Amino acid sequence: MLPIRDCVQQTPGYVPGEQPQTTDYIKLNTNENPYAPPDEIFNNLEEELKKVRLYPDPVSTKLRKAAGEVFGFSYEQILAGNGSDDILNIALRTFVNPGETVAFLDLTYSLYETIAKVHGATIQTISTNENFELDSPLICPEAKLIFVASPNPPLGKHLNRQYLKETCEQATGVVLIDEAYVDFSDEDHWDFIKEYDNVIVSRTMSKSYSLAGMRVGFGISSREIIEQMNKVRDSYNLDRIAQTLGANCFQFQDYFQSIWQKVRTTRNRLIASLRNLDFFVFDSDANFVLASPQWIEASDLYTKLKERKVLVRYFKHPRISNYIRITVGTDAEIDRLLEVIKQLKNES
């Protein structure tokens, strides 16, 4: 019998969204950016490809400096990761001994629970109200690490800012604020890093910078925290192509800001259109919306959309079992989605 750790055997594992191997689907299920990065980011790639026999910069210096210029922090306060998921794992290894407590909301990014269980941590979930929002700060005195996403998936709304501030003030451990979707909103938490010595903000280039296939993320915090996290980072955790493309993307802020605004405009149109089609839809600060059809079971709608080559995300979580999550695509993709939904509604 294989000597598999108990915590691994008891963990079902993270279930990612479908990644079809054909191109005939409208893919609105994994919150990727519908717009490609500018062609110019590939200009110096050939030079890097010639160096693939060599290890990349182990600490991603150029990438961190480029990120620091955009984020407004010294590169010494930034840790680069293989996607922001890497940052979450590094934080666990840095701050939480097996058996110690990790806290997060009862409805949030499901990877938090998976990686905490695999780490052997004790899990404390914090309840949200009937609207999946906080009624109070996240108070968990025994938690060595609190994961909190804002905007928070799968709802897509920012958490109450004052409650987050009080969470950071009262926490005895580290608070990691996951800002994977923040560029599609008007709010960030950079000031929390300057105000509190126990805060990490994580960012990803998968959503807003159109680099989901490259896996580039960051942890931003005090120099002291980043120094400790760097000790447990995997060696060479970003390949040279990811480092190069990530750094290049930061040179095109005007372009990316324009597509963030495009996504926000399309998102608002999608919300209004779904409401007109008899959906209950939450407002969103992200590049997706959470919607509940009032005329069909969400699981059935998910299946019928998939049969018509439109992929959305359905979760079996009991609190959102009659919701689907829809990534904001291009206007043409959203038009097709709405067209199919109208057809299905007329047939129901």
Swiss-Prot record:
Keywords of the record: Amino-acid biosynthesis, Aminotransferase, Histidine biosynthesis, Pyridoxal phosphate, Transferase
Superkingdom field: Bacteria
Family matches, as PROSITE patterns: AA_TRANSFER_CLASS_2
Cofactor(s) in the UniProt record: pyridoxal 5'-phosphate
Pathway named in the protein's UniProt entry: Amino-acid biosynthesis; L-histidine biosynthesis; L-histidine from 5-phospho-alpha-D-ribose 1-diphosphate: step 7/9
Top enzyme class: transferase
Positions bearing N6-(pyridoxal phosphate)lysine: 207
CDD domains (alphabetical): AAT_like (cd00609)
EC number: 2.6.1.9
Disulfide bonds: none
SUPFAM superfamilies reported in the protein's UniProt record: PLP-dependent transferases
Reactions that this protein is recorded to catalyse: L-histidinol phosphate + 2-oxoglutarate = 3-(imidazol-4-yl)-2-oxopropyl phosphate + L-glutamate
A GO molecular function held by the record: histidinol-phosphate transaminase activity
Single GO biological process annotation from the record: L-histidine biosynthetic process
Family statement: Belongs to the class-II pyridoxal-phosphate-dependent aminotransferase family. Histidinol-phosphate aminotransferase subfamily.
Subunit structure: Homodimer.
Record's protein name: Histidinol-phosphate aminotransferase
